[in-house]
């Protein structure tokens, strides 16, 4: 039997009122953070980035598709990957169904990855997504924003971590293994069909851009736990009696939606 506290209805109502006050405080703080996010200064994008798309090679400004705001998810699918990252895939699942609502608010949302376009197309068909997905292969877009690295860079970093015992553990990557690499990294590397160094050429991220007065501006970027707003199942699980219930297996339970039950 669970050792969870059992209460009367009156005791529950009193505790619920206390929690409600904290929930309202959390909501107000979220509103304030959203306001501050909107007020961040914009940085002009002066480099001419090119992307491979289903309609041929395009410039960054063309990706807005006639809207004034462009939201980009830096999806972890590197050149050596055979499949997309399962955690990133779960985020795409969340966003895919809300595209019409975003378009209604003058927002274009798309995925960008380093892998060749044909790989992205095949994986998109498998997942059944409608999300537009473009390859950054023709340009340094992902590298310049800090979400892609060369395999030489990652192999050197991984070798150094394993040789010295250094770790990349943080609140962003989950519990340490003692080997310098969190379990989620090795787990997802296997899942994407590459090795650790190949997997770490990519980092997850979210960036926003504005098209205003014939110029494009970079407005915002975030990564790691800053991406949880795209993981629609997490706030739902946070309201479940057992919460996320991940323990030390941080995000290792996440599968592609066609792999549960295997």
Please describe what each predicted stretch is:
Residues 1-70, 75-105, 122-128, 132, ...:
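Non-globular targeting/processing and membrane-anchoring segments
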Residues 113, 135-137:
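Residues at the C-termini of beta-strands that transition into short coil/loop
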Residues 103-120:
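Catalytic nucleophile loop
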